[in-house]
Regions:
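Short coil/turn segments at the loop-to-beta-strand junctions that recur within blades
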Residues: 9-13, 58-63, 109-113, 153-157
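Beta-strand C-termini and the immediately following turn/loop, strongest in propeller blades
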Residues: 1, 19-37, 46, 55-56, ...
Length: 201
């Protein structure tokens, strides 16, 4: 019987989030998600729990690992807050070498991206939308090249009935520095000269 042993230990002075480890080469290497430096990033360990290198770094947030291409030694992951002048809540798919080189955005565009990849990490099904756009689904290769549109929602009936998209907005917090993001839903018969009650949720 194989004995259990601790491979990786992580600690913080605050509440600690965790994500599943990704095994590479049947456990000869491990990819860990950690918030140890105040941002969520990926770290590469050997099978004994020795840190080999950081994979990602910077003032942005890795959310989760999507796929590891072991043959090319590339990890695909979802992250947010990296793209300047975009809503930091919007997730994108990125790829980077396990040695931390070659970081590349796979799903461009100021949208929230939900993705799935095939077992060989060759193709990406990219579902993307915002509250003020019509959702679409594209098939892409793993470098981010669009191959075809798979589906686009039909909003014609809603628009004909008077539907209007909500309006995203950005304001400064009380500190005058921090950006706050929100969405405004107006009545479909909105009159800019009238007064309306506001529900802050």
């Amino acid at each position: 019987r194989r004995q259990r042993q601790m491979c990786i230990r992580d600690s913080m002075n605050t509440y600690q989030e965790v994500r599943p480890l990704a095994a590479v080469g049947d456990g000869k290497e491990l990819i860990q998600w950690s918030e140890r430096d105040g941002w969520a990033h990926l770290y590469l360990y050997d099978g004994e729990g020795n840190l080999k290198n950081r994979i990602t770094r910077g003032p942005w947030h890795v959310d989760q690992i999507v796929k590891v291409d072991e043959a090319k030694r590339v990890v695909y992951f979802l992250a947010n807050g990296k793209e300047k002048d975009e809503n930091p809540y919007y997730e994108h798919l990125y790829r980077v070498g396990l040695d931390g080189s070659g970081l590349q955005q796979v799903t461009p565009g100021d949208y929230f991206h939900t993705v799935s990849m095939d077992d060989n990490a060759a193709f990406v099904v990219n579902n993307y939308s915002r509250v003020n756009t019509i959702p679409r689904t594209d098939l892409m290769d793993s470098n981010g090249r669009k191959l075809m549109t798979l589906e686009e929602s039909d909003f014609s009936g809603l628009l004909a009935a008077g539907y209007q998209f909500p309006e995203p907005f950005k304001v400064k917090a009380a500190d005058g520095v921090t950006d706050l993001y929100g969405v405004m839903y107006k009545p479909f018969n909105f009159d800019s000269t009238a007064l309306y009650p506001i529900i802050d949720y």
